[in-house]
Amino acid sequence: MNIDDKLEGLFLKCGGIDEMQSSRTMVVMGGVSGQSTVSGELQDSVLQDRSMPHQEILAADEVLQESEMRQQDMISHDELMVHEETVKNDEEQMETHERLPQGLQYALNVPISVKQEITFTDVSEQLMRDKKQIREPVDLQKKKKRKQRSPAKILTINEDGSLGLKTPKSHVCEHCNAAFRTNYHLQRHVFIHTGEKPFQCSQCDMRFIQKYLLQRHEKIHTGEKPFRCDECGMRFIQKYHMERHKRTHSGEKPYQCEYCLQYFSRTDRVLKHKRMCHENHDKKLNRCAIKGGLLTSEEDSGFSTSPKDNSLPKKKRQKTEKKSSGMDKESALDKSDLKKDKNDYLPLYSSSTKVKDGYMVAEYAVEMPHSSVGGSHLEDASGEIHPPKLVLKKINSKRSLKQPLEQNQTISPLTTYEESKVSKYAFELVDKQALLDSEGNADIDQVDNLQEGPSKPVHSSTNYDDAMQFLKKKRYLQAASNNSREYALNVGTIASQPSVTQAAVASVIDESTTASILESQALNVEIKSNHDKNVIPDEVLQTLLDHYSHKANGQHEISFSVADTEVTSSISINSSEVPEVTPSENVGSSSQASSSDKANMLQEYSKFLQQALDRTSQNDAYLNSPSLNFVTDNQTLPNQPAFSSTDKQVYATMPINSFRSGMNSPLRTTPDKSHFGLIVGDSQHSFPFSGDETNHASATSTQDFLDQVTSQKKAEAQPVHQAYQMSSFEQPFRAPYHGSRAGIATQFSTANGQVNLRGPGTSAEFSEFPLVNVNDSRAGMTSSPDATTGQTFG
């Protein structure tokens, strides 16, 4: 072995990287060139100056050879391969130096020789350093190889207990590219993708991927629990369950939360604690960090912000970081877009104009009578916005609209706001002049004229549905006007057309009003027309016909109260407003003022009403109905309204002789069935006094009273109209009813235990109507039942 080669190996192992490369280039270039006198002289001068004997150099060579042999024994095959690669790289570098010009070689060699003189101080010290430095690189390389070594070369314990090296994961899954060491592990993994479960339980047909899972499951059927707790004696199928149970006795809590450092005895409880307590907290922290600009990019920081991410594996951590970065970017973009939208579309009104949930800002239209006022808020120099008055509509209330506090002068006084009227749902009836004024103004809705007005309300209803039904019927009248006739509801005289009066009373009177509303000077209806006064709109007739057809068989109960053995009833029917008109008068007036087709329609309507009355009067089902009960006890019962709906009921007293046995009544018993009825509304509900048995004991006591009543009725009724006796009332009643739609003139009233039978009378003020004298009383017509013989009506 040449000295140059020995020196090369020595410098390679003892010197630094720069020194090794420089010394090697110097020696090789000096030996190969042979022509440069400078390098040879320098080497001779170095050897002479140091005066090193030849024997010492040989001894050093032997030491180097021994060290190289030891190094070869200690260095593994991989390290030797690395060493050979470094030598090859050095040779390539030497070839590049050989290709350099000669002048540059001298420049490179001169300073390098000086460094060699400095490094070589003593041979013994150098040998000691050589031994230490030979050991250190081997240990460092072993440590580095342990970290960088693949798991395929780690010693493991095989299934049979023998030691062996891990083979590389050559078995790759086709579905997810996962690598496995053996084909068994690969096949077990493929079962997850295919869903195949080859191991089946013989008792419950459950299937499993692995055999040990099947064996563990079979212990459930056999009841075998091989693992037992030493303290409490509980048994478990799995050993893991037993160990987890033992921690409840010992109080051991090996699992710690990495956020709050709290300890837990089970892993599932740790996961639940993290999920409930720390996940939302981490999200909030990340949002705050994004807002404050504390988070930087992954390339600059090089670490994750949350400790939870550090505990994850590297691949999962990278996936979560990518997802979180993508979500952060998307959230930042969404927030920026929202901010831009908010800036682009600023609200017209400030936040103070917002109202509670119960209110909403309704659509409004503001009339600007003056141009200066209309453009003042648009041309304001200060830039402030003054919105107009808004109409607030309460959603929960039923169509109670609040009007603006300040009204323009051009709006009619009909739309003025009165809170008390709106709260009571008062739907007022205005006069004709107010309606004419409102029709002239096209900006005002016609419904407002019906809802509010300056005149006093005739009646106000607390039932909103009834009021709205009245409003719908009023709209039929307005729709039929067609700019040719005006309809007005007035408080005044009685209408000249009785049939029209009856229909209008049925459509106007509210359902919640009692029967006492039909008194003198109550609501009267006058329908005025420019061309024809005897025509009822088709819509009103249609609604009345529909109402009769749907409610023909309806029936309402009437409550009566009795006190001190006197029959006390709350029925008070004063039908002075419903006149009686003979068929000749009705037909004559209709033929003079209306055409033949409309008269036929009215006659058909009257026939329909007559049929409805016949159905109610001849219905035998009313005989056993407990709708009328007269109780003659000494108890004082509270007076209740007799009829819940006066305008939509028909009060008809069925045969007067039909009181049941055991009754002591002052009324007359007649062999024939006399019908007595009063039509007030557009319905035909009857309230009969019915019974097939007669009381012969009470006939003698009431005969005098009935004779007196009949005689007085004949004396008063003959000067004006034809009188109908109670015994012969049925047949003459039908003939005048076919031609007229008026109510029956005769009135039946029971009040405070007294029975009043009033015949048709005359009046100076209303000579054409027989039922005006309402308040007159006749002492001879009143009678009260005997206290000793009073019984309960059937």
Swiss-Prot record:
<feature type="modified residue" description="N6-acetyllysine">
    <location>
        <position position="607"/>
    </location>
</feature>
<dbReference type="Pfam" id="PF00096">
    <property type="entry name" value="zf-C2H2"/>
</dbReference>
<feature type="cross-link" description="Glycyl lysine isopeptide (Lys-Gly) (interchain with G-Cter in SUMO2)">
    <location>
        <position position="132"/>
    </location>
</feature>
<feature type="zinc finger region" description="C2H2-type 2">
    <location>
        <begin position="199"/>
        <end position="221"/>
    </location>
</feature>
<keyword id="KW-0238">DNA-binding</keyword>
<feature type="modified residue" description="Phosphoserine">
    <location>
        <position position="250"/>
    </location>
</feature>
<feature type="modified residue" description="Phosphoserine">
    <location>
        <position position="306"/>
    </location>
</feature>
<keyword id="KW-1017">Isopeptide bond</keyword>
<feature type="zinc finger region" description="C2H2-type 3">
    <location>
        <begin position="227"/>
        <end position="249"/>
    </location>
</feature>
<dbReference type="InterPro" id="IPR036236">
    <property type="entry name" value="Znf_C2H2_sf"/>
</dbReference>
<keyword id="KW-0678">Repressor</keyword>
<feature type="zinc finger region" description="C2H2-type 4">
    <location>
        <begin position="255"/>
        <end position="278"/>
    </location>
</feature>
<feature type="compositionally biased region" description="Polar residues">
    <location>
        <begin position="574"/>
        <end position="588"/>
    </location>
</feature>
<comment type="function">
    <text>Involved in transcriptional regulation. Represses the transcription of a number of genes including gastrin, stromelysin and enolase. Binds to the G-rich box in the enhancer region of these genes.</text>
</comment>
<feature type="cross-link" description="Glycyl lysine isopeptide (Lys-Gly) (interchain with G-Cter in SUMO2)">
    <location>
        <position position="308"/>
    </location>
</feature>
<feature type="cross-link" description="Glycyl lysine isopeptide (Lys-Gly) (interchain with G-Cter in SUMO2)">
    <location>
        <position position="115"/>
    </location>
</feature>
<feature type="modified residue" description="Phosphoserine">
    <location>
        <position position="51"/>
    </location>
</feature>
<feature type="modified residue" description="Phosphoserine">
    <location>
        <position position="412"/>
    </location>
</feature>
<feature type="cross-link" description="Glycyl lysine isopeptide (Lys-Gly) (interchain with G-Cter in SUMO2)">
    <location>
        <position position="421"/>
    </location>
</feature>
<keyword id="KW-0539">Nucleus</keyword>
<keyword id="KW-0479">Metal-binding</keyword>
<keyword id="KW-0597">Phosphoprotein</keyword>
<comment type="subunit">
    <text>Interacts with HNRNPDL. Interacts with the 5FMC complex; the interaction requires association with CHTOP. Interacts with CAVIN1.</text>
</comment>
<keyword id="KW-0805">Transcription regulation</keyword>
<dbReference type="GO" id="GO:0000981">
    <property type="term" value="F:DNA-binding transcription factor activity, RNA polymerase II-specific"/>
</dbReference>
<feature type="cross-link" description="Glycyl lysine isopeptide (Lys-Gly) (interchain with G-Cter in SUMO2)">
    <location>
        <position position="402"/>
    </location>
</feature>
<feature type="modified residue" description="Phosphoserine">
    <location>
        <position position="301"/>
    </location>
</feature>
<feature type="cross-link" description="Glycyl lysine isopeptide (Lys-Gly) (interchain with G-Cter in SUMO2)">
    <location>
        <position position="88"/>
    </location>
</feature>
<dbReference type="GO" id="GO:0005634">
    <property type="term" value="C:nucleus"/>
</dbReference>
<feature type="cross-link" description="Glycyl lysine isopeptide (Lys-Gly) (interchain with G-Cter in SUMO2)">
    <location>
        <position position="6"/>
    </location>
</feature>
<keyword id="KW-0677">Repeat</keyword>
<feature type="cross-link" description="Glycyl lysine isopeptide (Lys-Gly) (interchain with G-Cter in SUMO2); alternate">
    <location>
        <position position="356"/>
    </location>
</feature>
<feature type="cross-link" description="Glycyl lysine isopeptide (Lys-Gly) (interchain with G-Cter in SUMO2)">
    <location>
        <position position="291"/>
    </location>
</feature>
<comment type="similarity">
    <text>Belongs to the krueppel C2H2-type zinc-finger protein family.</text>
</comment>
<dbReference type="InterPro" id="IPR013087">
    <property type="entry name" value="Znf_C2H2_type"/>
</dbReference>
<feature type="cross-link" description="Glycyl lysine isopeptide (Lys-Gly) (interchain with G-Cter in SUMO2)">
    <location>
        <position position="424"/>
    </location>
</feature>
<protein>
    <recommendedName>
        <fullName>Zinc finger protein 148</fullName>
    </recommendedName>
</protein>
<feature type="modified residue" description="Phosphoserine">
    <location>
        <position position="665"/>
    </location>
</feature>
<feature type="cross-link" description="Glycyl lysine isopeptide (Lys-Gly) (interchain with G-Cter in SUMO1); alternate">
    <location>
        <position position="356"/>
    </location>
</feature>
<keyword id="KW-0832">Ubl conjugation</keyword>
<keyword id="KW-0862">Zinc</keyword>
<feature type="zinc finger region" description="C2H2-type 1">
    <location>
        <begin position="171"/>
        <end position="193"/>
    </location>
</feature>
